[in-house]
Structure formats: structure tokens, C-alpha cells
Amino acid sequence: MEVILLERISKLGQMGEVVKVRDGFARNYLLPLGKALRANAANKTRFEAERATLEARNLERKSEAQKVADVLGGKSFIVVRSAGETGQLYGSVAARDVVEILAAEGFNIGRSQVHMNTPIKAIGLHAVAIGLHAEVEITVELNVARSAEEAERQTKGETLTSADAIYGIDEDALRPEDFFDPEADGNAEDDDA
């Protein structure tokens, strides 16, 4: 089905373009949400008549998104979750959790605006992309830790999943050279015991 886009849609096209999409995508998403019109002669003339107001509305939305981006962009948020010794979370931090964290800070972001390929399943510093508008995308940092103290240590650059952090063992002391004598003869008779 061919549709006329009423706003810029990422990976599809710019406002005013006539694009061919699958029927289900048009019927279930683009048309009901008012993001597109069916591409016929009547709708093309209607679009040209409303083009100026649509562009003004899009510009207004973009400027609002840019204001939020200026405040929110580059911020870091601490997420405290329970995790095992190796840093593996008992659960995960998903888009829903990111929305709740941002809402607690006073930002109104929808779950569909949070772009995460997979949920976060380990402690550490993680960058999360947020699409505020089709043309405005920012990145926030999530500091996932077991406690506020660990989050502070991670912020300073300490790795909490290393052997030293977990067991108090210096990883440099675990080199194979320290365990084996390269000069030793491998044909000792008491090896058969």
C-alpha cells in the first residue's frame, strides 16, 4: 500500500514522501496514529493544503524535544539491583525500568522512545539511547550496581566484576608463569602417582 507520510519516520522517509509499505503496517500503525494518509488524489491535495500547519507542528514538537534533550542529554542515573558475585543481575533492567527511573526524575518519556536491543543483565555503566523525536536522539548513562557505594566506585572507573573486586585477588598474580617453572623437567618419575 502506498501512503503519504505526515511526519518523518525513521527508516521509512521524510514528511510528504509517498512510500510503499506493507498493508498491515499501514492499517495497524501508520493510519490509526495519524502518521500517514493513503496515497490517493484526494489525500494528496488535502496534504498539500495542510502541509504548512503540519510542518509548523513538527517544528514545534522538535523544539520541545530539543529542550528536553538539552536537560536530559548526557545525564547519569544510578540503578540499584541485586546481583551475584560475578556481577550478573537477578533479573534485568529493561525499557520499562528506564522509563520509571526517568519519571522519578521528572521526565515524561514513553517506553517506545527507549531504544535498547536487549535488557541490561550485568552491573556496570551502560549507555541507553532515547529517541525524543524522529530527529532528536540522546544517550543517557545507567550506572547499574548492587548498592549506592558500588555505584560511586564504578563512577570513579573501578571494575567491580574483576577477580580483585570480587575475591580480593590480584589478577596479575594469577599468571601461568607464577604457577609453573619453565625450567622444570617434564619427565619426572613421581608424576605417575
From Swiss-Prot:
Residues 174-193 are annotated as: Disordered. Binds to the 23S rRNA. GO terms for biological process: translation. Coiled coil: none annotated. It holds the Pfam family Ribosomal_L9_N. GO terms for molecular function: rRNA binding; structural constituent of ribosome. The gene is rplI. Keywords: Ribonucleoprotein, Ribosomal protein, RNA-binding, rRNA-binding. It comes from the Bacteria. This is Large ribosomal subunit protein bL9. Belongs to the bacterial ribosomal protein bL9 family. InterPro entries: Ribosomal_bL9 (IPR000244), Ribosomal_bL9/RNase_H1_N (IPR009027), Ribosomal_bL9_bac/chp (IPR020594), Ribosomal_bL9_C (IPR020069), Ribosomal_bL9_C_sf (IPR036791), Ribosomal_bL9_N (IPR020070), Ribosomal_bL9_N_sf (IPR036935).
